[in-house]
Curated annotation (Swiss-Prot):
GO terms for biological process: carbon fixation; L-methionine salvage from methylthioadenosine. The gene is mtnW. It holds the Pfam family RuBisCO_large_N. Catalyzes the enolization of 2,3-diketo-5-methylthiopentyl-1-phosphate (DK-MTP-1-P) into 2-hydroxy-3-keto-5-methylthiopentenyl-1-phosphate (HK-MTPenyl-1-P). This is 2,3-diketo-5-methylthiopentyl-1-phosphate enolase. The keyword Zinc does not apply.
Amino acid sequence: MSGIIATYLIHDDSHNLEKKAEQIALGLTIGSWTHLPHLLQEQLKQHKGNVIHVEELAEHEHTNSYLRKKVKRGIIKIEYPLLNFSPDLPAILTTTFGKLSLDGEVKLIDLTFSDELKKHFPGPKFGIDGIRNLLQVHDRPLLMSIFKGMIGRNIGYLKTQLRDQAIGGVDIVKDDEILFENALTPLTKRIVSGKEVLQSVYETYGHKTLYAVNLTGRTFDLKENAKRAVQAGADILLFNVFSYGLDVLQSLAEDDEIPVPIMAHPAVSGAYSASKLYGVSSPLLLGKLLRYAGADFSLFPSPYGSVALEKEEALAISKYLTEDDAFFKKSFSVPSAGIHPGFVPFIVRDFGKDVVINAGGGIHGHPNGAQGGGKAFRAAIDATLQNKPLHEVDDINLHSALQIWGNPSHEVKL
């Protein structure tokens, strides 16, 4: 294979999956085949999409009810020749799912890139090992927290929040994805002030914390804004990838003048991936494609919290981010939304040690503030790695957190 193989979930009311698959393969490549003269067929053969797999699935009554008709469901795979498209994500996505996405009854499940095609994508600049080296933390999951309630607040408020989270033992603090350029907390001022706070905490407590600042602005201003952030001392760039496009992420990741990790936020991605019947699968969108395009971290809904993904999907995202690949470094999985210390054993059991535990309210809502919230999470992480039940841990901050949010992992064994 020198091109790309697309895997689709299709629904067909004519009950002929093979015919529908062939129609898709032709419609997204040469348009027609049987009515072409033999000589023209020979000329176009190398450009034709080829159906390589058709698998019928069991009938699903909920699907029939939703679509208001009886359909045959199936998984199909089509190989698209590399000759047909330039080696970039806009061309690949348009080839494999462009007008097909308008069908409303087809879901793009996966894209399998040939080795030749993979060479055109950067992958993470730092990856898991590189991030761990920045923090000098190699033996446990990382802990991340989020600035909360920053809109309308000044730099002083930001510095106080940042200091408390860092003292609490948080490894990474990220901006809220809805904090954009503004007069009270402009980009470079956030970075400079944040570094002063984090350096002070490091000198006093010996704990290193990185700050992920939100990269925003018009698309053609992003590189300039990113370089300003780097010059000001930015540790990590948070980026709302799907508000801009995967190719924009790749452009940032490939730029040698932006030598910092990039954290991909999933904002807007639900518009592409939420349906079980159409769109793009979450594992492909938030896992494989983000990694290929250069994200060092991928945030996605956890299976446990307030905006939950099905566990199978969340684990598939993580698999794509972390599986061995000779072409790409591994990206950090960041299962998010509604996470509190009682979920830590679940997260470690399901995602392993190479994960970022991301909390907002679970840190800021602690009765001892963000310092107490961070310490509660760190105690939960340490106990989990020792296979010690959380309720047996002699830590006042963790005990308080479990009283507030509960301990659903009471029976979890690693």
